[in-house]
Design a protein with these regions (language model features):
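Mature, well-folded catalytic/scaffold domains that follow N-terminal targeting or propeptide regions
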Residues: 2-521
Length: 521
């Protein structure tokens, strides 16, 4: 955990207090003043030790002074990784997973750092500065330190003989934020991997995109900034899930939470190891089409059956992400009534159904890799459920809409060399020609040209353009999926990225012009 370090005696004492509160019940304990006494003994503010000065810089610096301060930090020897860590911790402490812009921004921290590792020498900090600028700006809009959501929490003893994740799930379903927070605090005192696996019980009650992507991006971030921060970053998802129980439409959450245990039991997946039966290309392609065309419950059942047959989880995950990819390639774009500032009719960037579906499928696939056996199976079943749900959620005739690239654009291409094709792709991006950009990158891959150069082009605009909160995350989603998808299908992901990049061009990200000048100097 990442509050001020405690001795073993202090921790056991806190657990003992939690046990008494649990025994008496929250209401009686409150009447007796026990919960207040426990709270009075605890510090009121999270402290991040050696990182605290940097975290404070992220929260307190006026946004118009932030970028020069960050450059000074780099020049004084501060690692870029530490700036990312400080930004993430400042975000978590301020928003606690409860602010729309806030949780989108923390989900962009790890992708921005991964992008930084791909940038030209001297410009590595650009994608990180983009996200940190957005981060500090939103912290000030939210009210700064006085509006912090996360505070130290006392652990509540977990009942012996019970699965911690089930207890967390029960507290969430009761909408009991205090019990959920205290239960997770106790679970997070153990190995971070165990805390993550317990958390997924609560996450798996529904397939809302933010509920799904937030824990995966937090887990990815822990690999960069240290797993000792697991409690702070993962408890954001606890709070998100509890809050979601009170949202309008929460009653419709019922199907996943009923369907998942049914399928796990029906296919006898609990207690068995994942299979290792590798799939041929034809199977992956056909299975992705099955998922795409099915109802959500049918898709979930198909994934459970494939797991029971011993199909390799990686291949099932690959099919799920390819099904999600179709939602970008087939999308007709935002309808006139859906336009908002920065997202005009016909656009597919930002929170489009395709970007959301791909980010969700990527998260489920990665949580299947990171989780234990139960959560591997559960993540793939729910990933299949969600991609089918995403196809129908916002309407549209996705089954009959033609995927990009269409023959008209492909036949019109005359260039074959890599440089000329990339130039044509860039012209299409700058002209917001989504279909043409997709066709050019499809042809570029079909001819066997170097994907690194295509990614470099897309990355340039993922950094420079605003992207409506999704540019960095979606770029990273495509990078991960391209690298883990077989050769026969991987260029579908880059083709989708080309389309999204063309959609988002023309809306420069705040702070990027200043950051560019500072780093060049």
């Amino acid at each position: 955990m990442n509050t001020t370090p405690r001795t073993r005696r202090e921790f056991l004492g806190q657990v003992g207090q939690g046990t008494l509160i649990a025994t008496l019940g929250g209401g009686l304990a409150s009447e007796l003043g026990l919960t207040r006494a426990v709270a009075d003994d605890a510090p009121d503010r999270l402290d991040f030790g050696a990182l605290e000065p940097l975290v404070g810089l992220m929260q307190d610096t006026p946004v118009d002074q932030l970028l020069p301060r960050l450059v000074d930090q780099l020049h004084s020897g501060t690692a870029l990784r530490d700036l990312v860590a400080a930004g993430a911790l400042a975000n978590a402490r301020t928003f606690g997973g409860e602010d729309y812009v806030g949780f989108h921004t923390i989900m962009a921290h790890a992708p921005a750092y991964h992008m930084a590792m791909e940038m030209p020498a001297g410009l590595e900090a650009l994608p990180v500065f983009k996200v940190l600028y957005r981060n500090t700006n939103r912290i000030h809009e939210h009210g700064g330190r006085k509006s912090e959501v996360l505070h130290p929490v006392q652990p509540l003893a977990v009942t012996e003989g019970r699965v911690g994740g089930e207890l967390l799930q029960e507290a969430m379903r009761r909408k009991d934020m205090n019990a959920a927070e205290q239960t997770f605090a106790a679970l997070a005192a153990g190995p971070p991997e165990d805390a993550f696996n317990h958390l997924l019980y609560a996450v798996q009650d529904h397939t809302d995109v933010h509920r799904v992507v937030l824990p995966y991006r937090a887990w990815d971030l822990l690999g960069l900034i240290g797993k000792e921060q697991a409690h702070t970053l993962l408890r954001q998802s606890v709070r998100y899930c509890v809050k979601a129980e009170s949202w309008s439409g929460a009653a419709s959450y019922g199907e996943p939470r009923q369907l998942l245990p049914k399928l796990l039991e029906e296919h006898q997946l609990l207690g068995r190891a994942p299979g290792g039966r590798k799939a041929e290309d034809v199977w992956v392609d056909q299975f992705s089409q099955t998922l795409f065309k099915s109802t959500p419950s049918q898709a979930a059942a198909a994934a459970a059956a494939a797991l029971a047959e011993g199909m390799a989880p990686a291949d099932i995950g690959e099919a799920i992400t390819l099904a999600a990819n179709q939602l970008i390639l087939r999308d007709m774009g935002r309808r006139p009534q859906e336009e908002v500032a920065g997202k005009p009719p016909g656009s597919v960037h930002g929170d489009s159904i395709g970007v959301h579906a791909c980010d969700s499928a990527n998260a489920w696939r990665n949580m299947a890799r990171a989780g234990n056996t139960r959560n591997c199976f559960a993540s793939l079943i729910l990933g299949a459920y969600q991609v089918a749900q995403d196809r129908i959620e916002r309407g549209g005739d996705f089954l009959n809409w033609e995927p990009l690239p269409v023959a008209y654009h492909v036949k019109g291409l005359r260039s074959t060399g890599p440089a000329s094709l990339l130039k044509e792709a860039e012209e299409a991006i700058r002209g917001n020609l989504q279909a043409h950009a997709a066709a050019v990158i499809h042809r570029y891959g079909e001819l066997g040209h170097d994907p690194k150069e295509a990614f470099a082009l897309m990355r340039r605009y993922a950094v420079s353009e605003d992207g409506a909160l999704h540019a960095e995350k979606f770029y990273r989603t495509v990078t991960e999926e391209f690298n883990s998808t077989r050769v026969a299908f991987r260029w579908r992901h880059l083709t989708a990225l080309a389309r999204v990049t063309a959609s988002e061009f023309g809306r420069p990200a705040a702070g990027m012009a200043e950051a560019w000048e500072l780093l060049k100097a």
